[in-house]
């Protein structure tokens, strides 16, 4: 029996941490590796970066994962939810530089990377501790015995093995290609780290001299011996190799195949044609600089043009340009024609631009200058303008790998949720380019490549293995490649490397492929696609068939604030989940945000945001409220617009569940339930009804969860718990609990109360685990006989059609309508609940008579009725009554003598005026032609709403005239 009741006030702070400690110490989160007789279920948590703590976006995705693993665990699956951390190469290196060293100087030039790596590991330990704390406070049931860091030795082994296998099979190569180059970090970066910002600048119109005068051709104007090029980057003139025009442009078709001379350097370059040139943009002539523009690079490779790199890695002009052919190999021809005038040597690109413009003016070939809006590529971490740069890098050949990855999705071995992301994925995969996997930084996985003095490449796990394998003498010196691998390389191996690959161990056999991955749409290409490619190439099943990394991909939107702005620390609108769970004062919140953004240029806007959005700080809501709110916002694939006010609503829901549980415990504690539960006759109408609604709810909830409509699950729970269980069923039980002397009725009602609550707790547990565990611990001894001491290991409620009693559902619906009509009359007429009413029924079916008679006691108590009578036509002798048609009967509500006619007329007028206004607005909306034509579904719903309004209006008018004529 229950020993203690639950606390009077719901205070999540008093229960959540102790409950999590109980779960963790009891090893409830850990899978069964030894006695594996269950079906396995596995999710790999996308590893958060060690650069900082979790934000609401992490909390959202992890909550979705936790709901799934708790649901599957309760459905009897052997669950592994593995977690971990990502070393986040570039992001972490920038953080360490910012925190520990002079921001103006490159860390590589002034400090020993080995000493800095120690600092990174210290940071990692600190970050890991805080992130794990956040995960625990959110209630996430991860396997703490199966957590990994992407720089752990076992992960490092997998990374090396993957590289070696790909290289051995000619899928990794080293070559000179165009990449995003950060001149501050001195490294290539991925497209994901590049943002594009609009900037107001200039566009310069510069003349290129034609090789010979063509003014006599096609009636060209006299002296038209040049082409005018519009460019936003005049400094790259030094690297021009061609001029491109559209073959369908009549202005220039006669010049295709001819030549021009580049300004200042006077190099002879061809005029080529390609349909990529926009006839209507600029002058219709495009300068081609393959070494410093991605579009030009494609054209350069297509037409086998030389590539002239004019910049050093620091974006200063080289004294001697680096010339390559379209394959990235050194250009054989004489370099004399590719000289760079001395006046530009070693100039910063901005100074070189000024100098070029000055020279063009001096040579009188600068035709015009106009203001121009252009898009500038920026490293979103450093703010550095990115330069397309030809550099020697390591690449993976992706087209071969992509074929299997495409087939896995088209054949539905892997399914996207929602489905529309399938086409986005396939479009990108069909246009995939080779993947640059090398980075010129010190933090990350060193590329497992060594060179001898002749630059011969050796690939292996370590130098010792290489020497043994290649039988190299000790005299031969080897040096390891200084580059590290792109962070996404190790991340792409995550599902299997964290399960022990390349060793074919137990975890890998049991839990791979994993069941589902939860990810944001912004990294489909950078992570999801690469995981599929790498897994299918490297991991085989027992029949040597390619394994997929996961069976389903659930894509989430971005976390935005209520104004639609993406949440981020730099904007000051990012929220630490702990601040919602525990609460935080405005003063502390402001201090925290300013500390995290001490170098930001947006200090004033951050202060303004905090002052307006959190004038009183954030009150403590607890993890369950946060989880419930996040789940309610999980509309499939849509961005999440966070609004603090929604928390209040769901906190009230948790409070409601707590209070109704107190009520149930109070009325069911220390009672015996020795009854035949299969005998429906011993249960009241309301008992049979709530049991039916419970099983309908279980069915809908399970279906929504299986369809990954997490937002629907919250709506389903809210509707049942708040409206059906609390608002209706609890009210139906009170007359029985407080006034009934029927022992069997009391027992059956108490039994239905406690068993319904227990089912509600199990149903809700995956979303709100703490409050459900706490309450369940207080009641489980009454309703469970198994020896599992936690709700998380109880079975999830199962839908059983045998419990659906359609007649009871129909009868309670009739009673609810009856109650609503009588309460409405009290509201409109101002008749106090202290005044008991007399009601009667005309033309009533026998079934309804039985229903009323069976529930007579309940109805009189709930509605404060004095009498309920079944009437004949001659039973009414005056006009002091309202007659309201309801199903299978007519309701008569007698108007008592104590009645304020004036107040009633005023209220009726007010309600009639309001309903007329609603009708007017809706009719205006529906009379809009575009609305009726374009939104047929909405129009139909509006028509239904209008019919309801008119019906309500007629009822009000009828009742109004009855009162008026009294």
Curated annotation (Swiss-Prot):
Gene Ontology CC annotations of this record: cytosol
Keywords carried by this UniProt record: Aminoacyl-tRNA synthetase, ATP-binding, Coiled coil, Cytoplasm, Ligase, Nucleotide-binding, Protein biosynthesis
The family this protein is said to belong to: Belongs to the class-I aminoacyl-tRNA synthetase family. ValS type 1 subfamily.
Residues that bind ATP: 569
Function: Catalyzes the attachment of valine to tRNA(Val). As ValRS can inadvertently accommodate and process structurally similar amino acids such as threonine, to avoid such errors, it has a 'posttransfer' editing activity that hydrolyzes mischarged Thr-tRNA(Val) in a tRNA-dependent manner.
GO biological processes: valyl-tRNA aminoacylation
E.C. designation(s): 6.1.1.9
GO MF, one example: valine-tRNA ligase activity
Protein name as annotated: Valine--tRNA ligase
Motif ('KMSKS' region): 566-570
Record field: catalytic activity: tRNA(Val) + L-valine + ATP = L-valyl-tRNA(Val) + AMP + diphosphate
Self-association state and partner proteins as the record states: Monomer.
Domain remarks: ValRS has two distinct active sites: one for aminoacylation and one for editing. The misactivated threonine is translocated from the active site to the editing site.
Location(s) in or outside the cell: Cytoplasm
PROSITE patterns named among the record's database cross-references: AA_TRNA_LIGASE_I (PS00178)
Organism listed in the record: Blochmanniella floridana
Positions of short motif 'HIGH' region: 48-58
Coiled coil (UniProt feature): 348-368, 939-960
Enzyme class of the recorded protein, top EC level: ligase
SUPFAM superfamilies reported in the protein's UniProt record: Anticodon-binding domain of a subclass of class I aminoacyl-tRNA synthetases, Nucleotidylyl transferase, ValRS/IleRS/LeuRS editing domain
